[in-house]
Design a protein with these regions (language model features):
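A short, Lys/Arg-rich alpha-helix, primarily the initiator
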Residues: 1-17
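Residues in the recognition helix of alpha-helical DNA-binding motifs
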Residues: 10, 24, 35
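Helix-turn-helix DNA-binding elements, focusing on the entry/boundary residues of the two helices
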Residues: 18, 29, 47
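Short alpha-helical "recognition helix" segments of helix-turn-helix
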Residues: 20-22
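Key DNA-contacting residues within the recognition helix of helix-turn-helix
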Residues: 33, 62-63
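DNA major-groove recognition helix of helix-turn-helix/homeodomain DNA-binding modules
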Residues: 45-61
Length: 69
């Protein structure tokens, strides 16, 4: 389950628009929004791509954002 609040903070800090991030992931803006809101799950490849784009380098931060309980 994605920690929506933490992910939204990282997106805002990155300066990227959600439409740009969605395009980089091969998703529509709507598809990305559904994943951020936990309506659908991120694929491992999407998580890895977002980590690169959003400069999420620590495994702890990655886990806190994408594998929240």
């Amino acid at each position: 389950m994605t920690n929506t609040e933490l992910l939204n903070e990282k997106i805002e800090m990155s300066g990227y628009k959600r439409s740009y991030l969605a395009k980089q992931l091969g998703l529509s803006a709507y598809g990305l929004a559904k994943k951020i809101q936990n309506e659908t799950e991120f694929k491992a490849s999407e998580i890895n791509a977002l980590c690169v784009l959003l400069n999420i380098v620590s495994p702890e931060e990655k886990e806190a954002i994408f594998f929240a309980m």
